[in-house]
Amino acid sequence: IANNLYIQEVGTGKETQITNDGKQNQVINGSADWVYEEEFSMAKAFWWAPDSKKIAFLRFDESNVKEFTMTNYTGELYPDYETFKYPKVGANNALVTAHIYNTDSRKTVVADAGADKDIYYPRLTWTTDPNKVVITKLNRHQNHLELLSTDAATGNTTVLLEEKNKYYIDIDDNLTFLEDGKSFIWTSEM
């Protein structure tokens, strides 16, 4: 079960496994890695579509991230040690991809976010249209942001909005889609 994503039907208890490649300190599906928890205040990395027929999730490939051992002083005579993937400045981050699983077809598509793989997806937001999810894409320097409208059936993306700053772009949760599923309100410091 660790590092994989499952769906459980409340009424029947039936469980469906969405991913099967999760492995400790290798691949995480649907849960954030250390960087996303610290930098973007993200713990869970999955989001249901408004019609509950699709689930978008992030996949973190940590296989090229170096490990770090932390001492955990528990009050006992000897401390515990925890080793986990911990990228330091300039070192490899996890390779992150956005996926969309369809509960009817049981198929998963990968969002096409372009050629640059050294990026962040600090936010995913479904529009009111259950076939469109918007991915916030941010470069490694965190000074170039794109909102990508993503087709849930194909993974094809279109840039809705782009912001660049010489220094830094702060991430927030101020993206609201209106009832038509196309119009949105976005707050910005630019």
Predicted feature descriptions by range:
Residues 18-46, 54-110:
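Predominantly five- to eight-bladed beta-propeller fold
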Residues 19-20, 111-115, 161-165:
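Short loop/turn motifs that cap or connect beta-strands within the blades
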Residues 98, 123-127, 174-176:
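Beta-rich, blade/repeat-based domains predominating
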Residues 1-25, 116-122:
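A conserved hydrophobic secondary-structure block that centers on an alpha-helix together
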Residues 102-139:
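Long hydrophobic segments that form regular secondary structure
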Residues 10-13, 21, 102-106, 151-155:
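Short loop/turn segments that connect beta-strands within beta-propeller blades
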Residues 25-42, 116-121, 165-173:
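Short glycine-/Asp-/Thr-/Trp-enriched loop segments that recur within the blades
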Residues 1-4, 9, 44-47, 56-62, ...:
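Beta-strand C-termini and the immediately following turn/loop, strongest in propeller blades
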